[in-house]
Amino acid sequence: MKPLKFSWYFLPVLILAGESVFILPYVLSRIFRPTVLQVFQINNVELGLCFSTYGMVAILSYVFGGPISDRYSPRKLMSLALILTSFGGLVYAQFPGFYGLKILYGYWGFTTVFLFWSPMIKAARFWGKTSTQVKAFGFLEGGRGLVGALIGTIGVLVFAYFLNVSDSKFPNLEQSRNAFKYVVLLSSVIVAFVGFLVWKFMKVDQEIEKSVVLEKISLNKIKEVVFLPSVWLLMVIVMCAYVGYKVTDVFSLYALDVMQYNQVDSAEFATFLLYLRPLIAISIASFASRWENTLMLVIGFAVSFLGALLFSFGIITYSKTLLFLSSIFILAIGVYSLRALYFSIMEKGEIPLPLTGTAVGIISLIGYAPDIFIGPLMGYFLDKYNGIIGHQYVFALLSVFSLVGFFAAIKYHAIYCNEASHSLFESHE
């Protein structure tokens, strides 16, 4: 096989695609959650049910999309996913009713997962063979965070410009919809354009591409992955880490409900937090040669647990801005470091590169199950218990998952930290 060589723009385009595909279903609602609730005339539970619909479709997509990604080129699957996802933005901009919104989220569950998720992880592992896995996933996660933050900043500026009201804390429905519509349409154009960039610029040598694409997926190959202990531990690790990432969706709402920010200020605050994601992930990548990534994963869960506890105690109130900011920073370090690490440990777990898509699909079946239940559960707490009480329940829930993830990460570290990694490109016939 030829030596691995990638164009300098391979990783930047992969990073750009990796976040752009989730702008419409996730990033906008994370930054503009209070606005999304208003313009679609829904509550937190109903928004959570939309995410559940996404999650249920995504679960099936993980299972069947994983093997598909081992059969076809990541470039082709990812570019198609981005184009199809952008079409959903045209529907989103029409502000469909609750049931229409659920159908749309189900559609996005297919386009962003079946066609995109496993191919993206496989492409990152592929690129990481020329460097290290921690650097590959650290740069991917950090870059994705930077892309999300920049697009979020643009979105907030567009929203504030078109809102055009003197008191932006209480815009009426028509004003909010008019401003948010421009944000959605701009986002849709960006997603479609990135799809073109992926198709055009993520090409690799055909001989190299064939080395990581299987001619057919057999049941024996799937069984080979299913019976790896690392796959089962990664299911738990990813699930617990992902709950933390989902909880970041309520940061802007916490700023509005508890810290008494207005709509624009809460969106600006949520966007500011997005800039912590690349800072933390890239810092993790820079420590890759000094620390075991499995050990860093253990520390990440410990920090996430500490941050969640601070919020669950109910001591972070309107008058304690410094405590609010420092606690957010602690929690962000834990959550975002975990995002940069959990797929980087696949190589230590002896998961072969040609079967990455299948492995990611199986891991994600449980790992991303919070897409189904965590949204409605958070929505229930936030709607039933007004103000800080509802948020306390949400963060208490996160502390439990962080603790479970902590022990799963310790187990993974104990099993694999001293074992020599197998070659990613070894033959599996």
Question: Predicted segment positions?
Answer:
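Helix-to-loop junctions at the C-terminal end of transmembrane segments
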Residues: S61-S73, I280-N293, L382-D383
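Cytoplasmic membrane-interface "Motif A"-like loop-to-helix N-cap segments
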Residues: R71-L82, S289-V303
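C-terminal membrane-cytosol helix-exit motif in multi-pass small-molecule transporters
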Residues: G155-N164, L186-E209, A408-Y412
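Flexible cytoplasmic inter-helical loops of multi-pass small-molecule transporters
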Residues: W199-N220, E419-S427
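C-terminal transmembrane helical hairpin of 12-TM major facilitator-type secondary transporters
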Residues: T294-I345
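A late C-terminal transmembrane helix in Major Facilitator Superfamily
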Residues: E350-N386
